Amino acid sequence: MDSDTESVKRRKSSGSESESSVRDPKRTKIEDEDFQENGIDDEDEEEEEEEAKDEGDEDDEEKGEDDEEDDEEKEGEDGEGEEEDEEEDEEKKREEEEKYVTSFNFDGVEYKYKERPAVIEEREGKIEFRVVNNDNSKENLMILTGLKNIFQKQLPKMPREYIARLVYDRSHVSMAVVRKPLTVVGGITFRPFDTRKFAEIVFCAISSTEQVRGYGAHLMNHLKDYVKATSPVMYFLTYADNYAIGYFKKQGFSKEISLDRSVWMGYIKDYEGGTLMQCSMLPRIRYLDVNKILLLQKALIHKKIRAISKSHVVRKGLDHFRDSTTPVDPMTIPGLKEAGWTPEMDELARRPKRGPHFAVMQHVLSELQNHASAWPFAQAVNRDEVPDYYEVIKEPMDLSTMEQRLEADSYKTMEEFVYDARLVFNNCRAYNNETTTYYKNANKLEKFMVAKIKEIPEYSHLVE
């Protein structure tokens, strides 16, 4: 009975589960209607959102097109503005360049040359060149102090006290470049020896911020004209360091000293490591007009050349090479024979001008000449000062002779160059006692030369 009861209960339970799993049709219908109604509403909302989005996109596109048009108009305006600015800049640049050009007529022809900015500034009254010395006047002392400060800054190896002492020394004179009202931008301090007709340039410097305007060259031209006009001085002597040699060469200075040693020896200051240089001034030249004078000389020379030659005639190109690659006889080229050309000249022109070792030898020789110990060997020994020298030394040699031989391409190999260099030192040691300055300088300079040549691998074996 219990088992029957359990089976009945199980059946009832199964039935209830079946009933619960059957869906109510009425309820389902209502839910479907609600779902369908809600679904329609959602679709409408999505369509409205898409339409609004499309309208927004169209508005954005229209706005973007308007912005692009505005940008294009703005770019066009900016481009026009930039072009106008560029044209204005070019016009200003042309005007600035024309300001530096000076022209003059000679023999019916106009000649032009470019002036340095320093010349234009002086012409416009922005700068002036003043000669000052220590006369206790307030303004001159201010200028001398400005010069002293520039020299001390630009010449750091010089003792500051030494510079101050010479600048303020009453036997020295200075020419200063002064920017108005009273700013010193550079200058030269020199000591004239009127009775000996030379002056020693002691200091020469331009402020580091003003070195691209041609002040240095214009200052030297002013100094030359001033000294010639106010004194019998016709020569300048100065000791230049390695950095100043180039500047002084451009101003007409040379390492070749034509003045007799008795004129200047013991009068000028000797600087260790400096190179003595000389400038010989021409009496009939006004150095401030040197550009115009040189251009006039060039014009006169060209005029004389045109009178006896046809080298100024410009001929049209040869038609021979237009359709042909065959060689042409040079003698048939119009104007070539008249110019004096010969086949031998062509052969000479094809030869190499310098030997393969020239650059190396030139560099080593320049280093030797600029060395502090080179002064005894710079020139050949004076026969009048040392009468027995050439009796003892049968094969004399010096650095200036080596320079002449190098320029004449006499050294065919590096061995020949080293031989002459060693000859300089060996001659010195053969003639002088080992306790002398000359003997010691020979050792120092030879040691320096050996070190320099050892730096070049292909020639290092020559000094080992």
Curated annotation (Swiss-Prot):
Residues 127-282 form the N-acetyltransferase domain. Residues 20-30 have a biased composition (Basic and acidic residues). Its EC number is 2.3.1.48. Residues 31-90 have a biased composition (Acidic residues). It catalyses: L-lysyl-[protein] + acetyl-CoA = N(6)-acetyl-L-lysyl-[protein] + CoA + H(+). The keyword Ubl conjugation does not apply. Residues 1-99 are annotated as: Disordered. PROSITE patterns: BROMODOMAIN_1, BROMODOMAIN_2, GNAT. Acetylates histone H2B to form H2BK11ac and H2BK16ac, histone H3 to form H3K14ac, with a lower preference histone H4 to form H4K8ac and H4K16ac, and contributes to H2A.Z acetylation. Acetylation of histones gives a specific tag for epigenetic transcription activation. This is Histone acetyltransferase GCN5.
